[in-house]
Amino acid sequence: MGIKRFIIFLLTASLTITGKVNGQEPGMAKADSGCVQKDLSDVIRGALHKPPKIKKDGAGSLLLLPIIGSNPATGFMVGVGGQYAFKMSGSTLYSAFMGSAQVTTKAQVIFLLKNNIYTRNNKIFFSGDWRYLIYSQPTYGLGTTSPEGGVLDYQYNLLGTETTQDSLTQPMKFNFARFHQLVTFKIKTGFYAGFGYQYDGYYKIVDEKLRLAPGDTLLTSHYLYSQNYGFSTDHYIFSGLTANLIYDTRDNMINPYKGIYAAASWKGGMEFLGNEKTVNYFQFEWRSFHSLSKSNPRHLIALWLIGTFSKEGKLPYMILPATAYDQRSRAARGYTQGRFRGANLVYGEAEYRFPISKCSGVLGGVVFMNATTTDNVAKSLALFESIKPGYGAGLRIMADKSSRTNLAVDVGFGQNSFGFYLAASETF
C-alpha cells in the first residue's frame, strides 16, 4: 500500500493545484494579452528614466547572490553564489554554469561548481558537478523513520543547512571532494546517449558523538553501518564509470515552460578504480512541464521524480542516496540536506508556477508539495512503507528575461521542520 499512497499523494497535489489554476484562467488571458516581458534591470532603468537596454539574443547573463548565515556546526558563514547563462555559437538552447564559494568562522570551506552545456546545434551535452568541502553536517540514521530513540525538536534550516542542534542528531566533520562529469551525444532530436566518470571522496571523517571507551560507549549509525559492511570509518570513496541516456525536449534548460527531461544512469564502481568493494547502482530522473495557459505559458505545472536504487551494504554510509543530494541540492524543500538516507530512495514533487505581475511578468510565484521515501533493511523498513511530505511557497523575480533566469526565494515546511531558500534559477 505504501507505493499507492506515494502516487496518490503526488497526483492529489498536482490535481489540487491544477484545479485552482483553471479557476483563474479566464481572468488572466485578457490581462496577459499585449504585454511585454520585463526583468529586474528594466524596472531599475525605468525608475531611473533610462530606456530599456537592448541585449543581443543569446548574450550571456550573470546573476550573483550574497550568502550569509549561521548554524552551530559551521558558525557564521559568508560567501557568494550565482549563475552564468549563455548560448554557445550555433546552439538553440541556453547553457549554464552555477556555483558558490563560502567560508565560515570555524575554518570551513565550501566550493561548488556545476555545468550544463550544449554545443553547436545541440549535438553534445555536457553535465558536471564539482565540489570541495571542509565541512560539518549532522546525520540522522537510515530510513524515513529516523532517527531512532525519539522525535526531533522542531528544525530550522537555511539553504538546506541545519541551524539548530538536537540531542538525537549525529554530527560529523569531514573533507569532501566530488568530480561528476558526463558527456552525451545527440542520437536524434531530444535523445542523447553517452558516458561519464563519478568520484565522491570523504576524508578525515570525525564522528563527533562516537564513544568507544569501555563503560562510556555510544555507537552511531555511521559507525555501525561501516563496521557491519566492512567500510573504513574515517575515509572512503566511490569511483565509478557511468552510462547515461537522456531525453530532453525542454524549451529552456534554466526555466522551462514546456517539455520533458528524462535521464537514466547506470553507475559502476569497480575495485580497480579504488573502491573498497565492487558496486553497481541505478538512478533515474524525470522532470516535465505542462503549460496551463495559451496566452501566458508561465502558468504551468512542473513535476519532478527521482529514484536511486542500490544494494544494501554496497555503498559507504555518506555516499548513500539522501535528500538534497541532487545536482542543485534542491530536493525535499522543508527538510535539511541529508535528513533522510537509505540504500534506495524515491522522491517526487509537484509545483505550480504562476505570474504575479499581470503584465510585466517581473514577479512570479510558486506553490509546491513533495514526498520522500527511503528504506532501512536492518530495521525491516521497506521503500514506500514510510513517506515524509513537504510543502511550501515562493517568490520569483525575473532577473534576466532573455535566459529566463529567476531569483528564487522559497519557504518550505516538512514534518516538524522549516527551511528558507535563496537561489538563482528554478529548483528543477
Stretches with model-predicted labels:
Residues M1-M28:
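Bacterial Sec-dependent N-terminal signal peptides
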Residues E25-I44, K50-P51, P138-S295, A371-V377:
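Transmembrane beta-strand segments of outer-membrane beta-barrel domains in Gram-negative
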Residues K50-G60, M88-S95, R120-F125, K186-G190, ...:
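Short loop/turn motifs that connect adjacent beta-strands in outer-membrane beta-barrel proteins
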Residues K55-L63, S70-F231, R339, R404-A408, ...:
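Gram-negative/organellar outer-membrane beta-barrel architecture
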Residues G60-L62, T74-V78, L93, A107-F111, ...:
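Residues that define the transmembrane beta-barrel architecture of outer-membrane proteins
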Residues L64-P66, F97-A101, F126-W130, A193-F195, ...:
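Membrane-embedded beta-strand positions of outer-membrane beta-barrel proteins
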Residues F231, L241-N244, R250-K358, V362:
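C-terminal outer-membrane beta-barrel translocator/porin domains of Gram-negative envelope proteins
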Residues R353-G390:
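C-terminal hydrophobic structural anchor segments
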